[in-house]
């Protein structure tokens, strides 16, 4: 690969194959390649802070050395390549001066725009709401909350709003809940809360990613509550991203849940096959990778709905073809992507299946465990049975007890009902729901795997 940006992409793509998704997102995706300091036998990276610098060096330093030494990435051609990770230089902001929003706009990713967001039936409503919000001088809805599974484009749409607002010279703050917490604790410890409040309460657009992680942190929830109130009172636009609807964020204060629902809430659905193929083609273009049509169709059909995983599959095929000096064809794609097609939902617990179904249908787990005539609850109970039959060894008796069913024969009827709907393929909602539940199960199981591996 020619550019420094592509060298970084190639290194991270190879690293992503070696760790769980949650490890990659929390750690390795945070590092940046430093081409100016790097040489043929040593690679320098930046990490956002000292904690990440220490953690990544300890846990993944050897992995990065192995990748660079074995794959001869970019300019690193030595037999053994050393790796150094340093804390990235930070922009200093004077606590007494006005906040320089141009200096902190780097939190908005320039590459995520409305122009390169692939629109389909799964996300059209979200796209239209986001454009209206970004283009309006006063908030048309406030707050706006978009929710849905991982990798469906929520962060892209949040950054697109930020980029459009910056073009209009608006003051924009885009932050994750985790970074909001880190910043809050830092200013609290340094007794500089006036600077913290000036930064977050005096912007035109406050964009918060992973809002669900506010839960269970009383001091942070208290500060966010007052930040939200002041922004809302001053007609400043608030946009929130979450992996679930407000009522399903367990442990979040009721007063925050109610405020999240003041404006408009919209769900990002998993993409259908046509939209997935459009996404694959766009990602190929953005990464300057040429794939045969049949390979792009294969990726769309066999890789999960997670957009990041689709892009990872594209890069993985390209990297492996380069390393093996082989042409890209369908056989190569099948071989390279074999591990990505494994169904991580296998071996799910009943509790995870219940949680995945509940989140997908905006219900509480406790609601599903009790028999009800409400259509959405009845459907949820059938889906729990269906996925339990697919992914767990639990016998009929255990399933019946889990769902408080006295008639064990109901289990077979419930399973057959869902199976028939899916086989007939007449109900796009059910088909989409199946994929969403599978994605959520994959996420839950990946988190469990990452937790166990860290013990």
Curated annotation (Swiss-Prot):
Localization (cell): Cytoplasm
Gene3D superfamilies, per database record: 1.10.1750.10, 1.10.8.60, 3.30.300.180, P-loop containing nucleotide triphosphate hydrolases
Residue ranges of the region described as Domain IV, binds dsDNA: 322-455
Keywords, alphabetical: ATP-binding, Cytoplasm, DNA replication, DNA-binding, Lipid-binding, Nucleotide-binding
Positions of ATP binding: 151, 153-155
GO biological process: DNA replication initiation; regulation of DNA replication
Start and end residues of each stretch annotated as Domain III, AAA+ region: 107-321
Region annotated Domain II, chain positions: 75-106
Taxonomic superkingdom: Bacteria
Annotated CDD domains: AAA, Bac_DnaA_C
Gene Ontology CC terms, in alphabetical order: cytoplasm; plasma membrane
Molecular functions (GO terms): ATP binding; ATP hydrolysis activity; DNA replication origin binding; lipid binding
Coiled coil: none
Family according to the record: Belongs to the DnaA family.
Protein name: Chromosomal replication initiator protein DnaA
Organism field: Helicobacter pylori (strain P12)
Gene symbol of the encoding locus: dnaA
């Amino acid at each position: 690969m020619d550019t420094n940006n592509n060298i970084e992409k190639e290194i991270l793509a190879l690293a992503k194959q070696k760790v769980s998704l949650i490890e990659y997102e929390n750690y390795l995706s945070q590092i940046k390649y430093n081409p100016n300091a790097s040489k043929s036998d040593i690679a320098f990276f930046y990490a956002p802070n000292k904690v990440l610098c220490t953690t990544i060096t300890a846990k993944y330093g050897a992995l990065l050395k192995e990748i660079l030494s074995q794959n001869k990435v970019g300019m690193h051609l030595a037999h053994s390549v050393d790796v150094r990770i340093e804390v990235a230089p930070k922009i200093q902001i004077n606590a007494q001066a006005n906040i320089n929003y141009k200096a902190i706009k780097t939190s908005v990713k320039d590459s995520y725009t409305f122009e390169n967001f692939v629109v389909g039936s799964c996300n059209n409503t979200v796209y239209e709401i986001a454009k209206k919000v970004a283009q309006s001088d006063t908030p048309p809805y406030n707050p706006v909350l978009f929710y849905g599974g991982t990798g469906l484009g929520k962060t892209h749409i949040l950054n697109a709003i930020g980029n459009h607002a910056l073009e209009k010279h608006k003051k924009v703050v885009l932050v994750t809940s985790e970074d909001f917490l880190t910043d809050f604790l830092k200013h609290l410890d340094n007794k500089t809360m006036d600077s913290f409040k000036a930064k977050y309460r005096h912007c035109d657009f406050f964009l918060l990613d992973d809002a669900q992680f506010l839960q269970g942190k009383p001091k942070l929830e208290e500060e966010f509550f007052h930040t939200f109130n002041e922004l809302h009172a001053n007609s400043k636009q608030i946009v929130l991203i979450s992996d679930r609807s407000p009522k399903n964020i367990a442990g979040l204060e009721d007063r925050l849940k109610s405020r999240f629902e003041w404006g408009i809430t919209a769900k990002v659905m998993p993409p259908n096959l046509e939209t997935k193929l459009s996404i694959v083609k766009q990602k190929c273009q953005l990464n300057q990778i040429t794939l045969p049509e049949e390979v792009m169709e294969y990726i769309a059909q066999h890789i999960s709905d997670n957009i990041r995983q689709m892009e990872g599959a594209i890069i993985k095929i390209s990297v492996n073809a380069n390393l093996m000096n082989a042409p890209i064809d369908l056989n190569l794609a099948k071989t390279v992507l074999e591990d990505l097609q494994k169904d991580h939902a296998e071996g799910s617990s009943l509790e995870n299946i219940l949680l995945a179904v509940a989140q997908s249908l905006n219900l509480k787990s406790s609601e599903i465990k009790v028999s009800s005539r409400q259509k959405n609850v009845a459907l949820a109970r059938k889906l729990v049975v269906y996925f339990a039959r697919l992914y767990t060894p639990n016998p009929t008796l255990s399933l019946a007890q889990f769902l408080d069913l006295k008639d064990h024969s109901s289990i077979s009827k419930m399973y057959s009902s869902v199976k028939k709907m899916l086989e007939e393929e007449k109900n796009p909602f059910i088909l989409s729901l199946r994929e969403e539940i599978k994605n959520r199960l994959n996420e839950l199981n990946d988190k469990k795997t990452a937790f166990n591996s860290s013990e």
